Amino acid sequence: MATRRRWLTALRSFFRWCEQRKLLRTEPTWGIRLKLPKSDGHHTWSEDEIAAFEAHHAVGSKARLALALGLFTAQRRGDVVKIGRQHIRDGVLAVRQQKTGASLAIPIHPELAAIIAATPAVGQLTLLTTKSGRSYSACVFSEQFCAWCDAAGLPQQCVFHGLRKAAARRLAEAGCTAHEIAALTGHASLREIERYTRAADQASMARRAMAKTAAREQSGMESVKPDANKVSNPLKKLINV
């Protein structure tokens, strides 16, 4: 749908240019409206899909590093391809998002740190590089990541952006609040966070919610439990008679 929208925008610009120069009497795309289908956007990777990718691409490969960067930083492809060792200090990754301009400080997950350490450094500026040691552009990286997914036997719906959504899902399942998730993803809108975390495991989250409710109720009952030494017990009178 985004591709159709870009094509329509480009055509309208071209036809307006023609109209201004009297090459056209009317703008042919006038009145055209794209019907946007209801969608949650990119597919959120499942744990089985993540496991399949990991089973095919071993630690130490660029493919495995790309997966880890997507899962443990929750950043977009355009930001991930720019990440280098110079952006990591004292276990914290500094990211300035290309799309929003937001500056983020992201603690490095131990698993990501181990994978970075196990991956041979080819380039000097970025962690992800081509075989020749050059940094990826966002588009070329997307093509390469899709090839890695194909090699792992994953469906075409598994794209890199889906790892960002999987990261948000994992955070939600871990009990993180919307504000905590946004602190990592860089989202300014909590509504967008809600859309990202719709794939969270509803059943396990519901069990945790009910357990919290039960624990709170139990705590409240214990706080109002009567003290036998302070409250008169009518049975004592019967016993003493």
Regions found by a protein language model. Give the residues of each.
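Non-catalytic DNA-binding core/recognition domains of DNA-processing enzymes
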Residues: 1-18, 32, 108, 141
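Residues within the helices of the helix-turn-helix
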Residues: 2, 78, 179-182
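Basic, Lys/Arg- and aromatic-enriched nucleic-acid-binding interface segment
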Residues: 5-9, 20, 24-26, 30-77, ...
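Major-groove DNA-contacting interfaces characterized by cationic-aromatic clusters
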Residues: 26, 37, 92-96, 111-144, ...
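Catalytic-site neighborhood detector that most strongly recognizes the C-terminal catalytic loop/helix
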Residues: 44, 97-101, 178, 185-210
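Short, basic (Lys/Arg/His-rich) helix/loop patches that form interaction surfaces
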Residues: 55-63, 73, 102, 106, ...
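Short, polar N-cap/turn motifs at the start of nucleic acid-interacting alpha helices
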Residues: 86-92, 155, 176-197, 224-226, ...
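C-terminal secondary-structure termini that scaffold catalytic or DNA-interacting sites
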Residues: 130-133, 191, 210-241
